Amino acid sequence: MPFIQIIELRTTRPDEVEALVKEWQAQTAGRRTAQRGTFTQDRDQPDTYVQIVEFPSYEDAMSNSYLPETASFAERLTGLCNGPMEFRNLDVRSIEEM
């Protein structure tokens, strides 16, 4: 079953967040299980961003979490945020083309 993790964060340093994501991608090439990431900005709350990460399954997401680079990434990402991040862990029930 596909799995999506949504990470909501507040930051005044979005360019650094995006650079950190690209660095993590390079470090985990060929080993990460994340299939797609989408970084979005809230139009109504300009310092609020949402990262949407898609995985083949919950189990694949967990193996991705155990990569040493992911732990380092999370620690560094926390340092770029204004407050704690909020996580949503979602099992995909259906996907419909619109």
Language-model region placement:
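An amphipathic, aromatic/His-enriched active-site/gating alpha helix that lines ligand/cofactor pockets
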Residues: 23-36, 44, 54-88
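Short, low-order "capping/linker" segments at domain edges
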Residues: 91-98
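Short beta-strand micro-motifs enriched in acidic
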Residues: 40-44, 95
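Short, surface-exposed ligand-recognition loops at beta-strand->loop->(often short) alpha-helix junctions
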Residues: 9-20
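N-terminal/domain-start segments enriched in small and hydrophobic, helix-friendly residues
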Residues: 6, 16, 71
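Short glycine-/aliphatic-rich beta-strand segments at the starts of folded cytosolic domains
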Residues: 2-10
